A protein has these predicted regions:
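Start-of-domain marker
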Residues: 19-79
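Mid-length scaffold segments of soluble, non-membrane domains
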Residues: 80-145
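Extracellular/lumen-exposed scaffold segments
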Residues: 50-55, 60, 77-96, 113, ...
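Acidic, glycine-rich flexible loop segments
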Residues: 130-168
Length: 205
């Protein structure tokens, strides 16, 4: 009887967990659909010539809940503006906004989040945070220059990092028309992040 009661108590928790995973899957699916739509739109895509003509959609890693992480967030006090190097040799103005610390497979990691001093002048980007990172899938399953993640300023002391929504910079597909921020040394992760957009090394870069 006690075993039966325990199972009944656990079932709602299991059902809730499954519902949350299903919601996460749908969110990632929408991210993938939106990204593909952007690259298939001639007015928005970074692709040119045959690369655009032949593009059918991005390859993606399978969704994995382990790569949606609730990290501890600490805002940087009195950050100073700095010039972040880009792929073209030019620089863009940023400031460090905070740090996210988390564990993955039992090991601790940290990533720095940045704020674009140009984008925050636009109302729709006032809460936007930029997370560039590299990991051990680069140059194998993902772009050698790393990947990006778009975030918003958290209201508390945690921030959700969903690597399932990470993507390659435009420069991975067209190095001639774009200058993309280079991932800072501090954001190079010594681990494989097998989530988000994969990369087919068929583009001019």
């Amino acid at each position: 009887m006690k075993k039966y009661i325990l199972i009944m108590l656990m079932f709602p928790l299991f059902a809730f967990s499954q519902k949350m995973v299903s919601k996460d899957v749908m969110e990632v699916k929408k991210f993938q659909e939106d990204l593909n739509a952007e690259y298939l739109n001639s007015k928005e895509t970074p692709l040119r010539g045959d690369n655009f003509t032949n593009f059918k959609g991005h390859p993606f890693f399978p969704f994995s809940p382990k790569y949606k992480i609730t990290a501890k967030f600490v805002k940087t006090k009195s950050p100073k503006p700095f010039d972040l190097p880009t792929s073209s040799g030019k620089t863009k103005s940023y400031r460090e906004y905070g740090k996210a610390t988390f564990e993955l497979d039992g090991k601790p990691y940290a990533l720095t989040l940045y704020q674009s001093l140009d984008l925050i002048k636009q109302k729709k980007y006032k809460d936007y945070l930029f997370l560039p990172f590299r990991d051990l899938t680069n140059e194998k399953e993902t772009y050698g220059g790393g990947k990006y993640m778009d975030l918003t300023i958290p209201k508390g002391n945690t921030i959700v990092l969903d690597f399932n929504k990470s993507y390659q910079p435009f420069c991975a597909y067209n190095a001639y028309d774009y200058n993309c921020p280079i991932v800072p040394e501090e954001n190079k992760l010594p681990v494989e992040i097998r989530a988000g957009v994969m990369y087919e090394d068929i583009y001019h870069h």
